Amino acid sequence: MTEIAPGNVLAVATDVSQFAELVRLHAQVERSFGTVSLLMNNAGIGNNPGLPWENGEAWQKLVDVNLWGVVHGVQAFVPSMLASDEPGLVINTGSKQGITSPPGNYAYNLSKAALRNYTESLAHALRVACGARISAHLLIPGFTYTGMTGAADKPASAWTAEQVVEFLLERLAAGDFYVLCPDNAVDRATDERRMRWAMDDIILNRPALSRWHPDFEAEFARYMAAR
């Protein structure tokens, strides 16, 4: 445990894939600060294990961090938040890839799709359990310049982490559950069109991930141009 600033900031090395470590973190936080009122689960790794039938151990590692790391955080911290009778927030960091599922990193898409479903379920369960006292929210960043970006310099199309936080605070104040962030290349209208197309794959009985299917390439281009 490292004290970064006297009395108000602690950094604790934690393997979020291990529930016991989150329990230990929770105890340390409560000893230092008392009951938690804001829990932000920002666990994520972006390694690509490959195709759906490959590298099971690597798939497991990614899901253990990206999904189970968040579940562990909620299960370690939320019970005491509920018991405190104080207002609170839970923010889980998702991804647009968990909604539109672009081919490429299938395991990452899986983890973020499951996280979206989990956070939706969490929000509903909290509303039933305590009304509006503790709310859950899904942060869906756009292209953001972080250590996972892999670029030495910020790409022009990316937002900074600070921009994402400012947008998050604005949307939390408005009461949004889905905090869908734009970036410097993709606006909300574009995101909405892409997401609607993805949902229409089910409704219209198109092939899975038809946006990237050669038979639908021209139709998707016309659809996006018509907005």
What are these model-predicted stretches?
Residues 102-106:
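Active-site loop immediately N-terminal to the catalytic Tyr-X3-Lys motif
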Residues 124-188, 192-194, 198:
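SDR active-site lid
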Residues 42-47:
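Conserved NAD(P)H cofactor-binding loop of Rossmann-fold oxidoreductase domains
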Residues 74, 111:
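Active-site helix of classical SDR
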Residues 95:
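Residue(s) in the substrate-gating loop at a strand-loop-helix junction
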Residues 50-61:
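Substrate-binding pocket helix/loop in short-chain dehydrogenase/reductase
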Residues 13-24, 56:
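The beta1-alpha1 cofactor-binding region of Rossmann-like NAD(H)/NADP(H)-dependent oxidoreductases
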